[in-house]
UniProtKB/Swiss-Prot annotation:
TM spans (from-to): 42-62, 65-85, 97-119, 123-140
InterPro entries: Prenylated_rab_accept_PRA1
Signal peptide per UniProt: none
Protein name according to UniProt: PRA1 family protein 2
Residue ranges, Cytoplasmic side: 1-41, 86-96, 141-178
Alphabetized Pfam families for the sequence: PRA1
Subunit structure, interactors included: Interacts with CCR5 and GDE1.
Gene Ontology CC terms: endosome membrane; GABA-ergic synapse; glutamatergic synapse; postsynapse; presynapse
Keyword Ubl conjugation: no
Membrane topology: Multi-pass membrane protein
Species of the source: Mus musculus (Mouse)
Record keywords: Endosome, Membrane, Protein transport, Transmembrane, Transmembrane helix, Transport
GO biological process: protein transport
Length: 178
């Protein structure tokens, strides 16, 4: 296995401006929609990481303790999901067949915990909103040839990226590159 590397930052023109082609996904074909989202998450991961980082930095500047607590709760909740999927077959099957529901459950549990300690608004602003916008962009952005080639390289294991490892931990490794 090769080392984990962050792919290059994609041009703003490719990401959201001129050459970016957006279209609503077909809700009648959820498998194709899932492939589009996963492949866009892999291809634009550096751009998404930058957007998420800016959002976290802004929220951290405004409410540092709640932002840190929000990030910690989400990391722990994701860790529990990965651990449960590794030790229990039923959770593993659920994680593979319903990844959106698992992500929603992690975010809902995190929101409930943070609501109890008074940090729900910061959580919604610093974590949930950027995740929603990233998933919205990944759902709407049509793939181009360069995107497909990069995803094939990732899927055959010639190149490892942080998003590829995260998707693998969430049980979506078989979807990537399709």
């Amino acid at each position: 296995m090769s080392e984990v590397r962050l792919p290059p930052l994609r041009a703003l023109d490719d990401f959201v401006l001129g050459s970016a082609r957006l279209a609503a996904p077909d809700p009648g074909d959820p498998q194709r929609w899932c492939h589009r989202v996963i492949n866009n998450l892999l291809y634009y991961q550096t751009n998404y990481l930058l957007c998420f980082g800016i959002s976290l930095a802004l929220a951290g500047y405004i409410r540092p303790l709640h932002t840190l607590l929000s990030a910690l709760v989400v990391v722990v909740a994701l860790g529990v999901l990965v651990w449960a999927a590794e030790t229990r077959a039923a959770v593993r099957r659920c994680r593979r067949s319903h990844p959106a529901a698992c992500l929603a459950a992690v975010l809902a549990i995190s929101l409930f915990i943070l609501w109890a300690v008074g940090g729900a608004f910061t959580f919604l602003l610093s974590i949930t909103a950027p995740v929603f916008l990233i998933l919205l962009h990944a759902s709407l952005r049509l793939r181009n040839l360069k995107n497909k080639i990069e995803n094939k390289i990732e899927s055959i294991g010639l190149k490892r990226t942080p998003m590829g490892l995260l998707l693998e931990a969430l049980g979506q490794e078989q979807e990537a590159g399709s």
